[in-house]
Regions:
Chain A
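Hydrophobic alpha-helical connector segments
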Residues: 78-109
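C-terminal peripheral helix-coil segments that are non-catalytic and often amphipathic
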Residues: 1-9, 90, 94, 135, ...
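Helix-loop "lid/cap" segments that line or gate small-molecule binding pockets
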Residues: 97-104, 112-121, 193-198
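Short amphipathic alpha-helical segment with a characteristic S/N-K-E followed by hydrophobic residues
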Residues: 22, 37, 60-65, 75-79, ...
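Tryptophan-centric aromatic hotspots in well-structured domains and transmembrane helices
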Residues: 57-58, 129, 133, 168, ...
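Short hydrophobic/aromatic patch on the recognition helix
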Residues: 48-58
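Basic, helix-initiating cap at the start of DNA-binding domains
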Residues: 1-46, 63
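Amphipathic alpha-helical packing segments from all-alpha helical-bundle domains
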Residues: 90, 106, 110, 123-150
Length: 202, 202
């Protein structure tokens, strides 16, 4: 339990506890039953709150799930950075292998697919996702690439947003579209191929 | 109308016409109402057939939609090939710009998102998709890259499956996850970045 200021009213404390219970329930449930069968009723039952409590704070199950992902992200802290040992290729392989592990983890796989599905079909949710989750993560990646660019390891005219897409896009698409298994070897080869490019080097 | 062999029974002809009507209805409807609201009832009404006719041939709306995509693909012929002018970069830009146009076309956008969602959540459908749609398209792409590799334009040790992922994965992920607009300029820059790689060339 965290220490709380004395003037925090009990109601606000209860409200915060309910909120966390609801988000945890949504995240667990979507992993167990899938997004299609996720319901506000089910989340309410699992969290031990009334349906109306959920509807007071969120307009839809997609919105609940999205906040559940945000809560997960908060634990990682606002000052997150990718590793920087000076060896860009090794650092990126480490990060990409960790992403492979996460995507292969059954606790994350189904909730993340559910979120991706919602984003694919809902431009408004996609805009919120870009602003609150994808955007900040992208900045963290770009900061690492920028350091490499300053060190002369990346092309001077490289567009860092495109670089992020070329590094992470193939893995995410392979995962979402199930075009092949996600393995550490795939992660390594992806980094090598993106860094070196497809062209024959003369 | 195509010429038919004389011994084709009327029943088989009617059956083929119903099949095509159902698939066309499924494709049109998913674009209008989205996948969540697509129903066997709706497809049957639009196609002018009974629900039981659909259930006799397909177990689910996802299966109907998948066959609708296959029917669409059949029109493109089995001998499809990417352009080969000898200029790989120009040829790939042409292809990638055509993909951008297709993904931006409202007639295709929603049905293709619906199919992607189904694939993401259904490993069995994903396996059929890989075998019957993604696999053949991937072979066509690899054939063009192989020609470039033989011509000494691509790295000798390049894994062509990885090359396909690095070229197309970022665009497909950007489209599905709505991380940014799909433009001809994006298509061009993606090809250039994938071919040249991210590294500074000394």
């Amino acid at each position: 339990m965290t220490t709380r200021r004395q003037n925090t009213p009990n109601a606000a404390r209860r409200s915060d506890a309910s909120r966390r219970a609801i988000l945890t329930a949504a995240f667990e449930l979507v992993g167990e039953v899938g997004y299609a069968k996720l319901s506000i009723e089910g989340i309410a039952a699992r969290a031990g709150v009334g349906k109306q409590t959920i509807y007071r704070w969120w307009p839809s199950k997609g919105a609940v799930l999205f906040d559940a992902f945000l809560m997960l992200g908060e634990g990682e802290g606002g000052e997150a950075a990718l590793p920087d040992t000076g060896d860009l290729e090794a650092d990126l392989k480490l990060v990409m292998r960790a992403t492979v592990d996460e995507l292969n983890d059954p606790r994350f796989d189904e909730p993340m697919r559910a979120l991706s599905t919602e984003i694919s079909h809902d431009p408004d949710l996609a805009a919120v996702y870009r602003e609150r989750l994808d955007g900040p993560m992208r900045e963290i990646k770009k900061r690492r690439l920028e350091a490499a660019q300053r060190a002369g390891q990346l092309a001077e005219d490289l567009d860092l947003d495109m670089a992020v897409d070329v590094l992470w896009g193939p893995l995410l698409n392979r995962w979402l579209q199930r075009t092949g298994p996600l393995t550490p070897e795939y992660a390594d080869k992806l980094i090598e191929t993106a860094l070196n490019g497809l062209r024959h080097r003369r």
